[in-house]
Structures are given as C-alpha cells and as structure tokens.
C-alpha cells in the first residue's frame, strides 16, 4: 500500500509518500520558523496562509522524488488534529480534494499518534505494548501503548507542556524563538551546580507533571541577577543548564515510574523535545539499569513531518479505516478517543 501523507497542524508543512513494502519513498518539509520568529511565536493566520502557498508545490516535489503517479497511490492521509484550526483545514482540504479527484480513500490521522508511531519507521522498531513519552511544545503525555489505537494516559502535564516551558524560558533570557534548541545548546556551556531548580511533582506519587513552576523559578533567578538586560553570557548558560537539568530529571523520574508501574520493557520517546540530547542520554542511562529498551525517532522525525502522517495513515488504511466525506478537523482531540484498529496487534 502506497500512501501520500500531509501534515499542516502548526508551523511546518510536511508531505511524504510511504509504501508498506518499500518504506519511505520521498518527503519534503517547509518550516515557518523564520517567519514566526519576529513575533516571538506562531501567528495562526500567517501559518494558515503559508500552508496554502507551500503544500501543492511540496506535493509535486515529493511525487517526483518518489517517482509516483496518482494512479499508483492507494490513499491520502492528513492530520485532522489536534492543532491550529486554520492550518488543519488547509491540509485536510487539499488531501480530501486530491483523494476525491484521484478516486482514492482518505484517512484522518491524529497528530500525536503520528509522533508516537514515528520510531516505528526505524529499522529496529519496537513492538506493542510499550510506555510512550510524547513530549513537544504542545503536549507532554505518558501513555501505556497497548496496541495500535489503544492508548491509556498514565500521566500528563497539568499546565505547560515541556517544550512550551523551554520556549518561554528562552524568551525570558532573550534567546529568541524557537527557544528549546537554543536553551539546550547554551546549557552545554553552563556551570554545574551554580543554580538548582526544583523538580516539580516528583516528591509525590503519580505520573502527572508540571512545568509552569520552572518558568517562574527561571524568571525569579533572572530578576535576582538584575533582569534580562543585566545577564552575562555565562549567566544565561548557567540558567539554561539548571533549567534543562530540572526538566530532564522530571521527565526521566516520571518515565522510570511508568515502566515500573506497567512492567513494560520497552519505552518510546517522541515529539520535538525527544531530540534533546541530554534527555536522551539520561533516559537511556536510567532505563538500561532497569533492563528497558528505549526507542527514538531519527532526528528529522522528532519535529512535525509528513512521513509520520503517511506511515500512520497507511496502517489505518490497511485496517480498513476511511475518513467521512465531509471535511472534518478536530483542533482539540484527546488521543484516548482513537479507536483501536481491528487486527492491528
């Protein structure tokens, strides 16, 4: 089965073609980061307009790269949510129009299921069941992934997502947008032990998380040093290191509890923050002690991309799922509302 996938939930336009026998045949991605950076964050209206301009040229590019004609496709997959409503409508509208014109089935894909399944694109793919940590700018979830489409939430952030906290901490330090990668890079130059930030909600049972307190602690630390303008480069590096260490420790502690609670010996981490090298190293170290194998997507599949949507769509189309004819999106869409796919175990 060969599927065209379209991702447009936020500020990346991603297109890919995935074949269940040959793997990924082609992909293209356009990031709007530079456009949104001047505003310090994503502007939904600008994101939607840019998707309109980019998506069809990217589809043509990928079809050429994959040496694929419309008649060789078996379906079209698109991100239906969660995400920005206008951005989702662009991808959904184009996908449904192409599917109708090419007489192909279409399938709606949950954005976070796409992330969750991205590590399965790798040669050494994990089998169900496993614990999954989905950690990005919009979501931070710990899941018991029992089968394709059967997910139980073990814990989640009760306030800000981890990636959002990284971005806001970066903004407080004057590092610009997007802040997560900049904080991680700067943290490598930080002095260990100069500052120690709290590890929120790790002193109580349960798997829920909180990251808003880290933002407050960051702001208070900056103010204690005389404000953002008074910070030296070493101050910024030391704050970045303390912030990253606290966020990483919090996530690792919760993952450790999750594998102990479920008894699973496989852990998947996906989403934009899964590219953080400190988080990967600390998680691998802790899971190795417990005999748990850890799986990540390749770096290019950590952030939003079309490959994960094409892949997830292919699995759902194989199981007989089809999108209804009216174009429907779900800007808010709990992952637990996905139906388990019959025969997908």
Swiss-Prot record:
Keywords: Acyltransferase, Cytoplasm, Iron, Metal-binding, Transferase, tRNA processing. Its cofactor is Fe(2+). The keyword Protein biosynthesis does not apply. Belongs to the KAE1 / TsaD family. GO terms for biological process: tRNA threonylcarbamoyladenosine modification. Signal peptide: none annotated. The keyword rRNA-binding does not apply. Disulfide bonds: none annotated. GO terms for molecular function: iron ion binding; N(6)-L-threonylcarbamoyladenine synthase activity. PROSITE patterns: GLYCOPROTEASE. Its EC number is 2.3.1.234. Pfam families: TsaD. It catalyses: L-threonylcarbamoyladenylate + adenosine(37) in tRNA = N(6)-L-threonylcarbamoyladenosine(37) in tRNA + AMP + H(+). PANTHER family: TRNA N6-ADENOSINE THREONYLCARBAMOYLTRANSFERASE (PTHR11735), TRNA N6-ADENOSINE THREONYLCARBAMOYLTRANSFERASE, MITOCHONDRIAL (PTHR11735:SF6). Fe cation binds at residues 111, 115, 304. Substrate binds at residues 134-138, 167, 180, 276. Required for the formation of a threonylcarbamoyl group on adenosine at position 37 (t(6)A37) in tRNAs that read codons beginning with adenine. Is involved in the transfer of the threonylcarbamoyl moiety of threonylcarbamoyl-AMP (TC-AMP) to the N6 group of A37, together with TsaE and TsaB. TsaD likely plays a direct catalytic role in this reaction. It comes from Alcanivorax borkumensis (strain ATCC 700651 / DSM 11573 / NCIMB 13689 / SK2). This is tRNA N6-adenosine threonylcarbamoyltransferase. Binds 1 Fe(2+) ion per subunit. It is found in: Cytoplasm. GO terms for cellular component: cytoplasm.
